[in-house]
């Protein structure tokens, strides 16, 4: 990797910038009321990856470009306090651009912002936690705000919404009218 992309999970990551710029990794912390069982967490994570294929990607650098590539290896789960990867380029992450770790009653998901925004990763984490609770034997269900792992995946979920911005009426000039509106 060049000096333009130093993939660190510890807040020292800078994409196309220097140490004075913002980090490109975010963390979602989920606190549960019981201690986390890594066996159930690993199983829930494996099942969640089938519902969220858009985050099953890694990064490869060639010439002057960085390109996403599909990753199909198991997603590792790390216990906080034990040696963990500090870079997204660490081989222990199996090529993924996110890290899942836990400590007592807390679940941590660190991810590269090129992978998804907070809304997209929050949908993944909610589905992961719901499945974890189901595997743990709790009678939980969703009110519709959590994507079920059995739900259908739509291609638009993995697309950049900014690319569809031109289709929105608000991005058209004031004088623009749609003939179907009348």
Region spans (language model):
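Flexible, P/S/T/G-rich "lid" or insertion loops adjacent to the active sites of thioester-utilizing
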Residues: 159-182
């Amino acid at each position: 990797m060049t000096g333009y992309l130093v993939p660190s999970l510890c807040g020292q990551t800078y994409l196309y910038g220097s140490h004075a710029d913002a980090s490109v990794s975010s963390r979602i912390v989920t606190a549960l009321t019981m201690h986390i069982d890594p066996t159930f967490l690993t199983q829930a994570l494996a099942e969640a990856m089938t519902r969220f294929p858009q985050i099953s990607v890694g990064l490869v650098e060639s010439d002057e470009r960085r390109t996403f590539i599909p990753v199909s290896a198991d997603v590792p789960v790390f216990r906080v306090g034990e040696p963990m990867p500090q870079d997204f380029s660490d081989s222990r992450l199996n090529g993924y651009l996110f890290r899942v770790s836990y400590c007592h009653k807390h679940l941590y998901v660190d991810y590269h912002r090129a992978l998804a925004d907070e809304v997209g990763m929050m949908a993944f984490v909610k589905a992961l936690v719901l499945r974890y609770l189901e595997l743990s034997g709790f009678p939980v269900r969703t009110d519709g705000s959590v994507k079920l792992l059995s739900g259908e995946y739509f291609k638009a979920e993995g697309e950049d919404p900014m690319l569809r911005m031109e289709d929105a009426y608000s991005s058209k000039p004031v004088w623009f009218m749609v003939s179907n509106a009348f």
